């Protein structure tokens, strides 16, 4: 296996890194502007040409109908498509072009083909969104060896420098998503305690607040129709770029000026912070909720706060967190690059564990013995690491199964709860209803209810999202009616989902393939890959 690249597939910007021969994570800058981050914007320029990055972003003001941005907010949803040149593209398709552009820039800069990757996603992403992210990588022709949470990746980047055990809060405010994660860090181990967030809260919301203020002031000064502005896609695309730039300027200046149709509109920092205070408070509320979840596991406090994500450069973020958590050190953790670097380090970590397993097998010892020997000798493992890092994660959502209650009424019962450690296996006791039954219907729903937050942990249908509803087959052969069986729900370290069925009496277990309702099929992935292989990407 060659280099394993770490990719931060962001809502507004993306980044790719690798670990060099000295064990140092290195970000590959893009070809267009030599920046470490690439705008996550896709321009379907023509039927046979797609542009990604800064040039695509510039097309928002000239060709907005053919430009797709912030697609990450839609990933994992089957009903959304972006249409260009008569073809409808699912979020996985669009995301694959961003991944393809990152890989293309690596080839241009390093002369090396990107094959094996670790891709990050928000900690608050559910199973469908994680699966869709993996599918995007497959469409791009990449071997996705792991999906890892963005805050965990940032903690890996930070944690490898930690000399003593610490409990940290990773406050990750990106361009389109927000995560807050409580993590215990010590040499050789990173343990996620609790996570929360909002995948529709990010820097774009602050941009939109500026845009709303600009349009309001413009209408007030000119008397023009507000609807005419909102209906003009070129104007709105132009404002999208200008408002993002104004947000950045307001992080270091007292005011910013935006020109709309020859009219100069001034936005002051005071106005901006007042108009977006509710957004910041929403993130603070999530930190409180996540701290409360961590407290259920005995973690009552944190030693420091790490700021991750480009939107944390807004000074009001650090100010508000200082007020909320007085006397807690607040550090910037390389907001733009730490996630991709952490993902690359995690990839190197996977290689290190494989090397350890090989050493253990050759020496006739277990892996832990080899680890201790490596620590004593100081010998550097592959990728320059002195020891592997064990990452312990949690599931970010709760999962309910549709079952009959004592009155034979179908209800949703939560069996897996948010912030449960993964990997996990959750057996659900059932029984066959007829002799030689070959299948069993299973309906699984994702939700945000925590343990004990509803009576008997029953979840209302309107508060849950259907993940899958299918006949699972084949069950073990020749089961009589009333045979006890277990449906075993499994979630792995990456937050991906599978199901087994077990004959309790006979001890036989059958693994069942699961097709999530919103997930692209292998055939659809292959068709998309073949299509994009014939399209020029730049």
Describe the residue ranges of each PLM region.
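Oxyanion-binding/catalytic loops of NTP- or PPi-dependent enzymes
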Residues: 1-77, 84-88, 104-538
């Amino acid at each position: 296996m060659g280099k394993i690249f770490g990719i931060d597939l962001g809502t507004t910007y993306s980044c790719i890194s690798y670990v060099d021969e000295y064990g140092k994570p290195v970000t590959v800058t893009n070809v267009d502007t030599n920046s470490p981050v690439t705008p996550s914007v896709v321009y379907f320029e023509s039927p046979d040409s797609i542009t990604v990055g800064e040039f695509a972003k510039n097309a928002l003001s000239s060709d907005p109908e053919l430009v797709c941005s912030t697609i990450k907010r839609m990933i994992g949803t089957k009903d959304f498509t972006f249409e260009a040149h008569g073809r409808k593209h699912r979020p996985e398709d669009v995301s694959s072009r961003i991944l393809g552009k990152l890989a293309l820039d690596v080839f241009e800069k390093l002369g090396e083909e990107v094959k094996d990757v670790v891709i990050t996603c928000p900690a608050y992403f559910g199973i469908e969104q994680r699966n869709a992210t993996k599918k995007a990588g497959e469409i791009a022709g990449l071997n996705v060896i792991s999906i890892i949470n963005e805050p965990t990746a940032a903690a890996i980047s930070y944690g490898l420098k930690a000399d003593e055990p610490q409990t940290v809060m990773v406050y990750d405010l990106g361009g389109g998503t927000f995560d807050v994660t409580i993590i215990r860090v010590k040499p050789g181990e990173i343990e996620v305690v609790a996570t929360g967030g909002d995948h529709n809260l990010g820097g774009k919301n602050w941009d939109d607040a500026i845009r709303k203020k600009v349009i309001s002031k413009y209408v007030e000064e000119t008397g023009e129709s507000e609807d005419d502005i909102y209906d003009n896609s070129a104007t709105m695309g132009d404002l999208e770029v200008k408002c993002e730039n104004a947000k950045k300027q307001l992080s270091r200046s007292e005011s910013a000026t935006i020109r709309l149709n020859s009219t100069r509109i001034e936005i002051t920092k005071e106005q901006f912070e007042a108009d977006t205070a509710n957004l910041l408070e929403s993130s603070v509320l999530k930190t409180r909720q996540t701290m409360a979840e961590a407290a259920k596991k005995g973690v009552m406090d944190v030693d420091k706060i790490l700021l991750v994500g480009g939107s944390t450069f807004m000074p009001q973020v650090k100010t508000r967190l200082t007020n909320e958590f007085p006397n807690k050190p607040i550090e910037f953790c390389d907001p733009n690059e730490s996630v991709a670097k952490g993902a690359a380090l995690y990839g190197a970590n996977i290689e290190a564990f494989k090397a350890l397993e090989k050493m253990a097998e050759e020496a006739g010892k277990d892996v832990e013995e080899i680890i201790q020997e490596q620590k004593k000798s100081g010998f550097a493992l592959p990728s320059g690491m002195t020891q592997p890092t064990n990452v312990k994660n949690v599931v970010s959502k709760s999962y309910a199964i549709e079952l009959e209650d004592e009155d034979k009424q179908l209800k949703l019962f939560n069996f897996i709860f948010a912030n449960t450690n993964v990997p996990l296996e959750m057996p659900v006791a059932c029984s066959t209803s007829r002799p030689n039954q070959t299948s069993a219907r299973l309906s699984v729903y994702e939700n945000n209810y925590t343990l004990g937050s509803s009576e008997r942990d029953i979840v209302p249908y309107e508060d849950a999202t259907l993940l899958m509803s299918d006949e699972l087959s084949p069950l073990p052969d020749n089961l009589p009616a009333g045979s006890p069986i277990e449906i075993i729900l499994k979630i792995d370290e990456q937050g991906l989902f599978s199901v087994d069925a077990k004959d309790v009496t006979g001890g036989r277990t059958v693994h069942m393939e699961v097709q999530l309702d919103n997930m692209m099929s292998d055939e659809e992935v292959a068709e998309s890959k073949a299509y994009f292989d014939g399209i020029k990407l730049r």
